[in-house]
Amino acid sequence: MSAQSPTVATACASIRFAELEELLHQVFVRHGTSAQVAAILAHNCASAERDGAHSHGIFRIPGYLSTLASGWVNGTAVPSVTDVASGFLRVDAGNGFAQPALAAARPLLVEKARSAGIALLAIHNSHHFAALWPDVEPFAEEGLVALSVVNSMTCVVPHGADRPLFGTNPIAFAA
């Protein structure tokens, strides 16, 4: 008797980027984020989905909602941007998501990069930075070079190693 391979039929549907972004926005707001935080998270997740990185698209929504429901993350946090030096900003994300912290700092960071030739941003007191490329691409669109690094749980074992050393998304570059 031969093994039978079950066929799984899956329905596929297409949705326009703006519609997905709006749907995700509504989901985030209904689960306790401010409208501003929801817009930023929705854009990030929709961008990841559009770009084929499903692991950082709508796949992430249950995790986001779980952290909101448990109080692990503050969905209404208002990031506080501190101008530290001519080429340095620091953002306290207020125990919120990291993406809104970056969004709050981006205009001044771009200004500093143009005037000082280089700028550094440090975000602290934040949760889950998600996929990095949607957050560095706007700097490239401004004609700048951007490098983003993030610490995360170690789960990637480098070639030749015997234990995890890197997170799954430690570096992004845009030009």
Predicted segments, located by residue:
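Glycine-rich anion/phosphate-binding loop at the beta-strand->alpha-helix junction
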Residues: 118-175
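General structural feature for long, well-ordered alpha-helical segments within catalytic domains
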Residues: 16-24, 37-44, 57-60, 64, ...
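Alpha/propeptide regions of enzymes that mature by internal proteolysis
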Residues: 29-30, 39, 43-46, 99-102, ...
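Structural signal for hydrophobic packing residues in well-ordered secondary-structure cores
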Residues: 24, 28-32, 49-53, 65-72, ...
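Active-site cofactor/substrate anionic-group-binding motifs, chiefly glycine-
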Residues: 56-110
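N-terminal glycine-rich anion-binding loops that anchor highly charged ligand groups
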Residues: 12-20, 33-59, 73-84
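Metal- and O2-centered redox machinery and metal/ROS homeostasis
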Residues: 6, 10, 75, 100-103, ...
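Generic N-terminal amphipathic, Lys/Arg-enriched alpha-helix
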Residues: 2-31
